[in-house]
Amino acid sequence: MTNTKNQPKSNGLGATVIEYPDGTKRQQTTPDPKAAPVKLDFKLDLLKHIPDCTFKRYVLDVAKMTQIPANTSLMVALGIVSSVTTRCYVVTYDDSTQYQPASLYVICEQDIGTGKSWMLSTYQSPVFATEKTLVDAYLARQKAAEAAKQEFDEPYPNFSYDTDVTPEGLDETLARTRGYFCLASAEQGLANSITGAGYKSDGKTNKDLWLKGFNGEYHSSKRSKRGGYRGKVVGTVTSIAQYGVVDTILDNSDGTGAVERCWLISDPSNLSERMYGREHRHFPGEGHQGAYNRIISDLTAKAAECQSIEQLPGYRIAAADWDKIYALQNELKQHLRDGGKYSTAILKGITVKADIQIMKVAVNLAIMDDCPQGLIPSQWIDAAIGMFRDYLESVYYLLIDKGLIGTNALEDSVIAFLGDKTKTHTRSAFQQAKSKVKPWSELPKGGKGQVITDTFDGLEAKGIIWKNQDTGVYQLIA
């Protein structure tokens, strides 16, 4: 992949839908009918889809208290909520025979010194408090049984968060937790560990747990020096770390589908706008805090029982609401054709998981609104659909901003050159003609030739240009 980190950006970044004419390496495609011009000022607002409720007000309270954007607050909250709901309930498909766990993978990034740990610990607080109460009571009963010389075979109230663990290390804990794992951290190390980014360059990255834990799939491992696990695995991931954690996930997915399972939230930093002083302090409303603590405490007590996922009761979705999900899938599928707006591997992978993400978000929203087990009210399906639609759009712009799709100023210069029929379209001809004019003149002289090579190679990899191997002449695929 071309390194575009320090390349200047142009204004019209990469919204063009590419058509491949006959005679090239790719088949001709129909332009994506709804591909809109790129708007780099797209602002994600997930909260607008959620109707007024105590949970929404609490999320906004925590966002205001920590002065971290509300999208991040919402998704960190849902990540922690899912860490306990995952061990309590599932959500069933329309045939009622298959199900999805309530688990979510949430990856958020924020600036240094913005209170990321504060936000995470705020949402985890009732989990920790309940866990301590359960463990204290367990130890008291155990001590009483020993004093009375009675047998004591109660299962330990098993619930905890891992903050930095390798897949191999996590594998050892699965038998004890009946296949559940729960990861949460405000540090980059978690993302490095689960993606293998912290491994040596020649090390093998094991993403099996990461991939299978999302859907509650079967996992079997045999370790030469460690205990293995065989059975279904279900996991949750909540990470709010410094800027760069999203890049870590994107760079280390390796086409496995790992990144497509995540909610990637990269809210802008408001560090320069933060207000300090007692008059600017804000704390959650007592009623909002109390409702959140009560629901999470009850869920944590139930989650600590560690029932196998096959034994968990389920929420379900009404037929009319399934029709809404199917309608969204039919709407989005037209963007998946070659050259379509969401036709790149990452966006395609996210799009085809629309139903799964909607199911997972909706059941967690319903549970946090005190909805009893059974039918999920339509308002939470509508909210999850709206959230997913906007999230997908935000990832589209995020990938453009990070140079993974679309074009930058250097690439635009090459495209313009290849579009000039009076020029000989070789790499050396381009270097002679353009290396001393902007944007190329802004680059240091040393290594400029390599940047030109990388830019041509990157455009070829994106399917925007191709090279005649016999003549060395480049041609636009458009």
Where are these regions (language model features)?
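Phosphate-handling catalytic cores of nucleic-acid transaction enzymes
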Residues: 2, 9-478
